[in-house]
Amino acid sequence: MSELEQLRQEAEQLRNQIQDARKACNDATLVQITSNMDSVGRIQMRTRRTLRGHLAKIYAMHWGYDSRLLVSASQDGKLIIWDSYTTNKMHAIPLRSSWVMTCAYAPSGNYVACGGLDNICSIYNLKTREGNVRVSRELPGHTGYLSCCRFLDDSQIVTSSGDTTCALWDIETAQQTTTFTGHSGDVMSLSLSPDMRTFVSGACDASSKLWDIRDGMCRQSFTGHVSDINAVSFFPNGYAFATGSDDATCRLFDLRADQELLLYSHDNIICGITSVAFSKSGRLLLAGYDDFNCNVWDTLKGDRAGVLAGHDNRVSCLGVTDDGMAVATGSWDSFLRIWN
């Protein structure tokens, strides 16, 4: 037997031992524990606003922390800052590259960021003295497309990329301060924990990983999906997270139990998931699908509680406001819808 084959067998045995240890700790299922709880009932949401202005597919959106303004990125080469109450466009920012895949709003409301097939994370200052929006920093360094970005504050941002890495950047110096390596496929999505000390990533190696922002180490790895993970989102208390995959399932993983708690799927759903987000309490999990719908799941019981139907093409992105009062969905039909 070759040395490589021997090592492979040892690794397989170790993995089985870890899985057995996890199973030994798993003395009950989430469905059993929540069996006495009331169901959330039928969730019906209506479209309250439709944001029209993009001329091509919308690829990404992100709410500002005021729960009123949001940023969206489209294949039309524009980044638009919207007032969701009035549907007015506060800013329409022309991008140097129209192949944008992600956008983010800084917690302060002073900056937005975007990136995509240009491999660069571009930071835009919304609060310039002249009143015009301009690029304040460009962060080159990834060797693959930029799939997701999220601000820690006005001076730091975390990015994920098709080069299989994530990175923490010092925006002022435009330097990567930490690189997070460990995935063996394109990293598609990231989600910051509520305390901003860790983040979780989902990738095309069908695994999700928990990273410590301070030292760059991978703290935990989670498997279970059988296809690319397109979206991840932290549970509001920071102790769990959800994933959405091309295998047509969403899954809930618990950090303390170190394993999957629940799978969200339906026989009628055979298409991939593009985006996931929790309600403010965490009781509902919203997921955007390739079949033009957004499904609402009862997080604790695993039942489908509702459907947001209205888009005429793939739902590519969604987000819940910080105050929990509204959901925004963005679609390849070029429209954003605000629901509650």
Swiss-Prot record:
WD repeats by residue range: 53-92, 95-134, 141-179, 182-221, 224-263, 268-307, 310-339
Family: Belongs to the WD repeat G protein beta family.
Matching Pfam families: WD40_Gbeta
CDD domains registered for this protein in UniProt: WD40 (cd00200)
Gene3D superfamilies: YVTN repeat-like/Quinoprotein amine dehydrogenase
Modified residues (N-acetylserine): S2
Modification sites for Phosphohistidine: H266
Tissue: Strongly expressed in lung and placenta, whereas it is weakly expressed in brain and heart. Abundantly expressed in the axons and Schwann cells of peripheral nerves.
GO BP: G protein-coupled receptor signaling pathway; substantia nigra development
Disease named in the record: Charcot-Marie-Tooth disease, dominant intermediate F: A form of Charcot-Marie-Tooth disease, a disorder of the peripheral nervous system, characterized by progressive weakness and atrophy, initially of the peroneal muscles and later of the distal muscles of the arms. CMTDIF is characterized by onset around adolescence of slowly progressive distal muscle atrophy and weakness affecting the upper and lower limbs and resulting in steppage gait. There is distal sensory impairment with decreased reflexes. Nerve conduction velocities are variable, ranging from the demyelinating to the axonal range.
Origin: domain of life: Eukaryota
TM region(s), chain numbering: none
GN (gene name): GNB4
SMART domains in the record: WD40
Residues modified to Phosphoserine: S2
A Gene Ontology term for the protein's cellular component: cytosol
Organism: Homo sapiens (Human)
A GO molecular function held by the record: signaling receptor complex adaptor activity
Key words of the record: Acetylation, Charcot-Marie-Tooth disease, Disease variant, Neurodegeneration, Neuropathy, Phosphoprotein, Repeat, Transducer, WD repeat
Primary role: Guanine nucleotide-binding proteins (G proteins) are involved as a modulator or transducer in various transmembrane signaling systems. The beta and gamma chains are required for the GTPase activity, for replacement of GDP by GTP, and for G protein-effector interaction.
UniProt-recorded name of the protein: Guanine nucleotide-binding protein subunit beta-4
InterPro entries: G-protein_beta_WD-40_rep (IPR020472), Gprotein_B (IPR001632), Guanine_nucleotide-bd_bsu (IPR016346), WD40/YVTN_repeat-like_dom_sf (IPR015943), WD40_repeat_CS (IPR019775), WD40_repeat_dom_sf (IPR036322), WD40_rpt (IPR001680)
Transcription regulation found in the keyword field: no
Self-association and partners: G proteins are composed of 3 units, alpha, beta and gamma.
